[in-house]
């Protein structure tokens, strides 16, 4: 039940009513922040994505600050999660994604992103439209970046032509409401803290 509650709070339609941001971000209101959206294009797989500040500061309870886990382990599909949002990416027209969440994160602070997946079967690739088929193969992707204040970022974790890929986009809203996504590199590589 707890997992389902958390998942519901990650849905855009319910985001405002969930008190959605972790206490860490609520307690840092007024600091320079960026917006981070996390999406997945994987279907029928078990996956978990987490992100954390690289400086690894701890709060008075000894917990790591700035840690969040948008995804929950489980065999969720877009339909089961109650979402029908479609995301258009270069090389992937209108592919549905499983889940979506949006977070306020401290700007100018390095973040590390860790995405882990256990593929249970197959799924459509979002880069070339190919299909990746495996059976209980665990794949980990780790990358980092430093968000800029006021910018909106999207992390997309999906199945590429050969394996799950972790990609970072900067989102810009132009006049007239049109939204564009520009691919940007992870600039910190495979680092931990």
Language model regions located:
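Sec-dependent bacterial lipoprotein signal peptides
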Residues: 1-20
């Amino acid at each position: 039940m707890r997992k389902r509650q958390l998942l519901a709070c990650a849905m855009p339609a319910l985001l405002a009513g969930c008190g959605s941001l972790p206490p860490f971000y609520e307690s840092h209101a007024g600091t320079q922040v960026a917006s981070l959206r996390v999406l997945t294009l994987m279907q029928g797989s078990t996956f978990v994505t987490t992100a954390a500040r690289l400086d690894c500061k701890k709060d008075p309870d000894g917990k790591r600050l700035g840690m969040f886990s948008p995804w929950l382990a489980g065999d969720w599909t877009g339909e089961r999660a109650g979402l029908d949002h479609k995301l258009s990416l270069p090389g992937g027209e209108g592919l549905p994604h499983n889940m979506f969440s949006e977070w306020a994160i401290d700007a100018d602070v390095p973040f590390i992103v860790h995405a882990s997946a256990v593929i249970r079967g197959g799924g459509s690739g979002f880069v070339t439209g190919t299909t990746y088929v495996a059976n209980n193969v665990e794949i980990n992707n780790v990358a980092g970046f430093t968000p800029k204040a006021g910018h909106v970022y999207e992390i997309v974790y999906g199945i590429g032509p050969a394996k799950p890929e972790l990609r970072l986009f900067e989102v810009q809203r132009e006049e007239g409401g049109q939204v564009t996504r520009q691919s940007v590199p992870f600039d910190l590589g495979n680092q931990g803290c």
